[in-house]
Amino acid sequence: MATSPKSTFVLGHRHLLGIEGLSAHDITGLLDLSEEYVELNRQVDKKRTVLRGRTQVNLFFEASTRTQSSFELAGKRLGADVMNMSVSSSSIKKGETLMDTAVTLNAMHPDILVVRHHASGAVELLARKVDGSVINAGDGAHEHPTQALLDALTIRRNKGRLEGLVIAICGDVLHSRVARSNILLLNTMGARVRVVAPSTLLPPGIERMGVEVARDMREGLNGADIVMMLRLQRERMNGSFVPSSSEYFQYFGLDQKKLAYAKPDALVMHPGPMNRGVEIDSIVADGAQSLIREQVEMGVAVRMAVLEALARNLPNA
């Protein structure tokens, strides 16, 4: 069995519902603990026992492969009993409300619930009805805190810092919980954030979040240290936000020509899943400047760190 972590960081919150509300100290503590798990996950023995005897329920109202499997693996490596609830075959499909589901689950005394929901704010509502800790695995276009944390860890490991870096977040900012959480985190940590998108994919008043706004890639990528592409989320679109996928790629898809607008040592990120040929070219996605595969690796480490940090607040921990 692997040794205990050196970090003694305790997150001063019962839940992780978003990046909003986290201090720079909180974020740094989670990233430092995550670093330990990066190294652990590269060893033969990846097990720890910090969640032994604890129950983790993964409740996903939206389909997910990466995030759900990452949380499942994280919980199991920490020794938790992990249960994945299938919404498609549950009482929710039979008309049970979100609050009814929360009350029912709470009666089973889970220690940690990992929840994804299509409605912004739904995870926070559920958290009010349960006794255990709740982790927001994505709620509508609101927040996705563990994605922002894993992105920050990836950047810090490759650039050595977050403060002072120019981060260009490009694409469907309007519908992206990843963009919102990253903006909040990066601003807190002193990065310079720029969003790049057509006007139809920019939230009204986005400047009030403390970001620069560019409406073309040449301007947006100029001097960027990190180019973070976002998926075009057609499932959240009820109108015509872009003329066509091919035209969108022509102006806002990341190819080698547009990447050259950024710094020569700029690195490329994408939260996945990627629409190749829509928001990013395969040559760039699979190229030497891409951190996309590393982001997946960092995801497991970050989720292990979050689970452990919250578990330290649980009764009898």
Swiss-Prot record:
The keyword Nucleus does not apply. One of its GO terms (cellular component) is cytosol. It is an enzyme of class 2 (transferase). It comes from the Bacteria. L-aspartate binds at K94, R177, R231. One of its GO terms (biological process) is 'de novo' pyrimidine nucleobase biosynthetic process. It catalyses: carbamoyl phosphate + L-aspartate = N-carbamoyl-L-aspartate + phosphate + H(+). GO terms for molecular function: amino acid binding; aspartate carbamoyltransferase activity. Belongs to the aspartate/ornithine carbamoyltransferase superfamily. ATCase family. HAMAP family: Asp_carb_tr. This is Aspartate carbamoyltransferase catalytic subunit.
